[in-house]
Regions:
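Single-stranded nucleic acid-binding surfaces, predominantly the OB-fold ssDNA-binding core
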Residues: 1-114
Length: 114
């Protein structure tokens, strides 16, 4: 028998790359997007300390979108708890494209910027 239980959960702690861009649906729901940088530290092939930055696309709907618009700022350290969502589409040229985003279930500022 196949186990149908699964988990799609992401927890990221990083710095906001750009202040959220917010738009609203026809029914007034906020949709905010921003980038979040996380860093991985490890030795490179030469044995020297190295840093790799990974950029994540964050999508916040409804009350989380409103919160992001009002309180989240570029450079701020935040914790984002959410789930992965991958969208796929064809470009005008017929090329298959995809984008993976983290849909936020919560956004917690870890340092408050004025």
């Amino acid at each position: 028998m196949i186990n149908k239980k699964s988990i799609n959960r992401v927890i990221l702690v990083g710095h906001v790359g750009n202040s959220p861009e917010t738009r609203y649906t026809k029914d007034g729901r906020a949709i905010s997007t921003f980038s979040l940088a996380t860093h991985e530290f490890k030795k490179n092939l030469s044995g020297e300390d190295g840093e790799k930055t990974e950029w994540h696309n964050i999508l916040a709907w409804g009350k989380f979108g409103e919160f992001a618009e009002q309180y989240i700022k570029k450079g701020q350290l935040v914790c984002v708890d959410g789930r992965l969502k991958t969208s796929k589409w064809l470009s005008k040229e017929g090329v298959s494209l995809s984008k993976t985003e983290i849909v936020a279930n919560s956004i917690t500022p870890l340092d408050w910027k004025a």
